[in-house]
Structure formats: structure tokens, C-alpha cells
Amino acid sequence: MTSPNILLTRIDNRLVHGQVGVTWTSTIGANLLVVVDDVVANDDIQQKLMGITAETYGFGIRFFTIEKTINVIGKAAPHQKIFLICRTPQTVRKLVEGGIDLKDVNVGNMHFSEGKKQISSKVYVDDQDLTDLRFIKQRGVNVFIQDVPGDQKEQIPD
């Protein structure tokens, strides 16, 4: 089994939206968006809504649970240029623990909620988020905060 061609993994609690569909996908040259989310993988309505973005901009889209991603991503065809989208750092950590080789993890949007502190203009984290991001980074993955491709990359605080 060959390694899948994962161009980028993004943490964005909005998952698929116009910014992901237009800016990120075209900038990195992806032709397949894989949404890794246990809830969305079983929600036809959310899949249809996100699928509209994919259809509009001409790239493929799949919706997988964490477990299915771990089990099938290695079977991706070489021509598939994959952009993984996850809602939380916990999801990405589970992918790494499951043996998926990630090179770059972009933290895009993590909205404010009670108990979270701001670490950049659009990223709010709690202690568990930071623990998971540091775990991912300690596994040799390049983890950075960047809203859109033209913005300067910021590092996760140690």
C-alpha cells in the first residue's frame, strides 16, 4: 500500500465553506476533499450542503468517520490530491494515532466557546485542544495557524 497524497489537513470548525472551496483547494491544488467527522459522515443534509461547494468548484468530496478514514485513506489512487478537513484537533490526533502520515496541519477556525482562550484572531483553544495540537506537532507534523493562504503562518504556543 502506498502513502496517500495528502496535501494538507485543515482544522476548521465550519468544515467546508466558500473559503475552503475556493481559496485553499485551488491554492494547494487538491482535487479531492475528505471531510473527517463522525457526525457529518452520518448526516445526509450536511453532506448535501457541503457537496454543493464541491460541485460548484469542481472537486470531489467524501465524508468519512475517523475510523473509516484510518482504514481506507491508504487505498487512495495516486492521482488523488487530498485535502483533509477536520472539525477539531482531537480528530486530527486520532488520525495520527491511527497511523496516518500527515505532513502539514493548518489550524484555520476554532470559534470561541466557554472555557476557550484566544491564541490568534480566529483560533480559540482549551487545554485539551492545546494538548492535542502539541501531540501532533511532537510527532513531526508541521502545525501552524493560517486563516487564508496569503496570511503569515503563526505557530502554536508551547
Swiss-Prot record:
Annotated catalytic residues: 17 (pros-phosphohistidine intermediate)
Uppermost EC category: transferase
Keyword field: Cytoplasm, Kinase, Phosphotransferase system, Sugar transport, Transferase, Transport
Biological function: The phosphoenolpyruvate-dependent sugar phosphotransferase system (sugar PTS), a major carbohydrate active -transport system, catalyzes the phosphorylation of incoming sugar substrates concomitantly with their translocation across the cell membrane. This system is involved in N-acetylgalactosamine transport.
Major localization listed first in the record, in broad terms: cytoplasm
Keyword Cell membrane included in the entry's annotation: no
SUPFAM superfamilies reported for this sequence: PTS IIb component
Gene: agaB
Biological process, per Gene Ontology: phosphoenolpyruvate-dependent sugar phosphotransferase system
UniProt-recorded name of the protein: N-acetylgalactosamine-specific phosphotransferase enzyme IIB component 1
Occurrences of domain PTS EIIB type-4 (ranges): 1-158
Any one GO molecular function term: kinase activity
InterPro entries, per database record: PTS_IIB_sorbose-sp, PTS_IIB_sorbose-sp_sf, PTS_IIB_sorbose-sp_subgr
Organism phylogeny: Bacteria, Pseudomonadati, Pseudomonadota, Gammaproteobacteria, Enterobacterales
